[in-house]
């Protein structure tokens, strides 16, 4: 697609000698003897892009495959919901839809309470941090082994939380004995970490970490943005879990989701938009939300009625 979009006339490669047959099949032609060293030989080859290249033509017609963690490809029934007529978030229809969606989320996450806010997953994490601050849980330990763990450190500090950072190399596992020692010696109110560190593709050992944290009576908050929907997991022993509509739930980004297993406190000195307690106590929807986003998420969640979604 890159070649076609930029209308190039010719392409050059240094092809590995092991794949010369494949290169010729695609249409590449050798134009020089091998280069490099005896241990690492390469074939100078070119591809005439003005010729009638059957392979390139076939590639141009091929469907693009999306391997991003988000945004993701949508199922046809989810796409269909995005074409529906918008209706009021104050309507009985929308209230009923939201309640049904929350019920599905609570079952999938295995949490007592689910809350939906209009925003990205970052908003979900920020709302959790506002709860921590509002509860007087000011001292925390943030675990990081990738880009999004590092982001949690920055976010918690912006919420004026006093945090230490247990940081290991990108993609490395946390030393559980060292974590236990840090929590025993420190005066921590909460621990915050990423379940699946998207930047390096490592699924952290949340079971073991949870056991250590809860044995100390410490509150546990988890960024599960790219693990929820991709990995079957019960968050019943986690106090707060953040996720969104736009990753492995396979809907459209735009709805921030917080699962909680503890009482949500009222935050009188926090921006209303971050107040999970306020969002939950309302008998109607507190802020404007596009009905099509809720329709799409509700439909996407139907794929999780059985465990087949995780096996395929």
What name fits each language-model region?
Residues 73-74, 246-312:
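Active-site C-terminal subdomain of aminotransferase-like
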Residues 174-225, 229:
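Active-site phosphate-binding strand-loop segment of PLP-dependent enzymes
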Residues 111-141, 145, 149-153:
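Conserved beta-loop-alpha segment that forms the PLP phosphate-binding cup at the N-terminus of a helix
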Residues 235-246:
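Conserved active-site segment immediately N-terminal to the catalytic lysine
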Residues 4-64:
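Terminal substrate-recognition subdomain of acyl/acetyltransferases
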Residues 151-162:
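Active-site-proximal loop->helix
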Residues 63-118, 122:
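A glycine-/small-polar-enriched, mobile loop at the entrance of the PLP active site in fold-type I
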């Amino acid at each position: 697609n890159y070649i076609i979009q930029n209308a190039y006339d010719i392409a050059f490669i240094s092809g590995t000698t092991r794949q010369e047959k494949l290169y010729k099949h695609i249409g590449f032609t050798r134009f020089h003897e091998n280069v490099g060293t005896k241990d690492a030989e390469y074939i100078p080859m070119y591809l005439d892009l003005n010729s009638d290249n059957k392979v390139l033509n076939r590639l141009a017609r091929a469907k693009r495959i999306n391997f991003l963690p988000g945004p993701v490809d949508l199922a046809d029934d989810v796409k269909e919901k995005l074409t529906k007529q918008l209706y009021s978030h104050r309507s009985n229809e929308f209230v009923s839809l939201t309640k049904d969606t929350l019920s599905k989320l609570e079952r999938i996450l295995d949490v007592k309470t689910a809350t939906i806010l209009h925003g990205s997953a970052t908003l979900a994490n920020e709302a959790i941090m506002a709860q921590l601050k509002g509860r007087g849980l000011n001292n925390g330990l943030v675990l990081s082994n990738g880009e999004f763990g590092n982001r949690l450190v920055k976010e918690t500090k912006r919420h004026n939380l006093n945090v230490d950072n247990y940081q290991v190399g990108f993609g490395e596992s946390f030393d559980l004995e060292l974590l236990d020692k840090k929590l025993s010696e420190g005066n921590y109110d909460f621990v915050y970490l990423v379940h699946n560190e998207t930047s390096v593709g490592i699924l952290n050992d949340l079971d073991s970490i949870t056991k250590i944290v809860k044995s100390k009576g410490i509150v546990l908050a988890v960024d599960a943005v790219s693990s929820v929907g991709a990995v079957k997991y019960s968050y019943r022993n986690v106090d707060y879990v953040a996720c969104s509509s736009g990753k492995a739930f396979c809907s459209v980004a735009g709805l921030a989701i917080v699962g909680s297993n503890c009482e949500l406190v009222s935050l009188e000195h926090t921006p209303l938009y971050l107040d999970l307690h306020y969002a939950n106590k309302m008998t109607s929807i507190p802020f404007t939300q596009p009905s099509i986003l809720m329709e799409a998420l509700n439909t996407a969640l139907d794929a999780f009625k059985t465990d087949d979604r995780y096996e395929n």
